[in-house]
From Swiss-Prot:
Subunit organization: Part of the FGAM synthase complex composed of 1 PurL, 1 PurQ and 2 PurS subunits.
GO molecular function, one term: phosphoribosylformylglycinamidine synthase activity
Gene Ontology CC: one annotated term: cytoplasm
Subcellular location(s) of the protein: Cytoplasm
Organism: Synechococcus sp. (strain CC9605)
Name of the featured protein: Phosphoribosylformylglycinamidine synthase subunit PurQ
PROSITE patterns (UniProt xref): GATASE_TYPE_1
Domain of life of the native organism: Bacteria
InterPro entries associated with the record: Class_I_gatase-like, PRibForGlyAmidine_synth_PurQ
Keywords, in A-Z order: ATP-binding, Cytoplasm, Glutamine amidotransferase, Hydrolase, Ligase, Nucleotide-binding, Purine biosynthesis
Pathway the protein acts in: Purine metabolism; IMP biosynthesis via de novo pathway; 5-amino-1-(5-phospho-D-ribosyl)imidazole from N(2)-formyl-N(1)-(5-phospho-D-ribosyl)glycinamide: step 1/2
Gene Ontology biological process terms, A to Z: 'de novo' IMP biosynthetic process
HAMAP family according to UniProt: PurQ
């Protein structure tokens, strides 16, 4: 099992992700500079949190043009597992691998707190380990409000592609959405940070089972 973590100028959670996947879970993990184009040696790709390219224009808008992401489109089309966390989720929507968009929080403030979450669908491997369907993960974002059209929301519901919802909806996301998958379930994007909840020494392990899904 080999994991690639794509690093953009402005990424700040890539080392956290590598520590979680490699240090905690023993998965061989390499950080991949955004100019690299060969992703063929990886079993899964993670887009980490941060502020890619300073979030200029809007979050993820510039990162979508990175050479590595053009290769990521092909990787995902072949069924490769892709996980986008926080800014990574924003990038996946800009890239078109996931529908909708992430916009400014409803209260216009940066939110940093532990968020109670509910597993909405256990259809995909990402969520199958959460038998109790309730978990808590850290969030830290200023543009995490998930927005989509009514037609897109219906499609997400029809595809059973809403993976996670907020218990208290801190940012005003439509339908309390915290994370979604593509129709096949191979691509997951979420605003909460599972990599920050893998070790009891730093406050919980609710993110661990989600990352273990990278093992297939």
């Amino acid at each position: 099992m080999s994991i690639g973590v794509i690093v953009f100028p402005g990424s700040n959670c890539d080392r956290d992700v590598q520590w979680a996947t490699d240090g905690c879970l023993g998965m061989s993990t390499r950080r991949v500079w955004h100019e690299e184009t060969d992703l063929s040696g990886f079993d899964a790709i993670i887009l980490p949190g941060g502020f890619s390219y300073g979030d200029y224009l809007r979050c993820g808008a510039i990162a979508r043009f990175a050479p590595a992401l053009q290769s990521l489109i092909d990787f995902a089309a072949k069924g490769g597992r892709v996980l986008g966390i926080c800014n990574g989720f924003q990038v996946l929507t800009e890239l078109g691998l996931l529908p909708g968009a992430l916009t400014r929080n409803q209260n216009l403030h940066f939110i940093c707190e532990d968020a109670p979450l509910k597993v909405v669908s256990q259809r995909t491997a990402w969520m199958q380990g959460y038998n109790d369907r309730a978990l808590t993960l850290p969030i830290a974002h200023g543009e995490g409000r998930y927005q989509c059209s009514d037609d897109t929301l219906k499609q997400l519901q029809d595809d059973d592609a809403i993976a996670l919802s907020y218990g208290n909806n801190p940012n005003g996301s439509v339908f309390n959405i915290a994370g979604i998958t593509n129709a096949s379930g191979s691509v997951l994007g979420l605003m909460p940070h599972p990599e920050r909840a893998c070790d009891p020494a730093i406050g919980g392990t609710d993110g661990r089972r989600m990352l273990e899904a990278l093992l297939g």
